[in-house]
Amino acid sequence: MPGISIHVVDISRGIVARGMRAELWSAAGDGRFARLLEGEIDDRGVLAHPGLDQIFAAGRYRAVFHVGPYYRSEGIASGAHPFLDVVHFDFGISVPEQHVHLPFKCTPWGYSCFRGGA
């Protein structure tokens, strides 16, 4: 099944990051990025957006995770300048027919994102 799936887990508390805002962008030929879609992480920890269930052309993409606002809304991060605020993760698609799964694991102080196997 082609497409992109994004799964977000707040590993500092061992729960999915329900309510975190996430976006997907694509790179244009001039190197600038254009937003394709955005939404919030659901109760399963997934960015459920119909735009993710398509074949994405080969190229450069950017997943954007609003970590700081999420932790502020949860009462965990405070202050005007959290350590992590908005995280950009750039990745490429070489084979459009393959599914790309992006597991994003975060705390208020760090994150991990990689190509998963789901």
What are these regions (language model features)?
Residues 94-118:
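Compositionally biased low-complexity segments at domain edges in trafficked proteins
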